[in-house]
Amino acid sequence: MFPTLFDIIDFLRIENADFICLQEVNESAKAGFQVSSLKEDLNMYSHFGANVVALGSNYGLVTYSKYKIKSQEHIYLSSEKEQRGMLHTVVKIGFGRNLNIINLHLGLDKDERKVQIKEVENFVKKLKDPYIVVGDFNQGNLDFNKEIFKDAAVSVNKNNTLTFGASLDRIDYILVSPEIEVKYYDVPMKNMSDHYPIVTKLKI
């Protein structure tokens, strides 16, 4: 049995994270305006991007932040089947420092994901400030450029922790720029969706 939106809000309130990245959210009347409801109840800044707009649904990604959002963009990734994309959100974290948050959802097809991952890597290479890349990669044993990405789970020996109950692999990731230190990583076995939530503490 899936939780209600109120269950998810309660969980997120308890975690009290500075940033929250969600995938497969639906900002439509029939879904209870999930994005707006979460924004109001959590009292956070938000950035939403719909990858799919059809049949009364606005279906995509949302990033919430306790810090004011400096800039934002929604970027479509190359997709042959269902449209996939990523949100790029820039927040100011103090002392003139910026942080890039990239929230993404990759495709189900292996060849399609290879192209999408390369697009994300090429995008990240252009960034001048620290970055966090999070989301549903739909792939275990992810092959990525280790010169520009550090896997938060691997950094604290949690790489065998599953994030999706129906898979034997970890398919959700938090990747950070090399200079970011991973202090904590956990996957609470909470029934918040078909994926488990990931919680991490970073030193930037």
Where in this protein do the model-derived segments appear?
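Active-site beta-strand/loop signature of hydrolases that rely on acidic residues for catalysis
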Residues: 8-31, 89, 100-104, 120-146, ...
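Aromatic-acidic/polar surface patches that form glycan- and anion
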Residues: 1, 27, 109, 113, ...
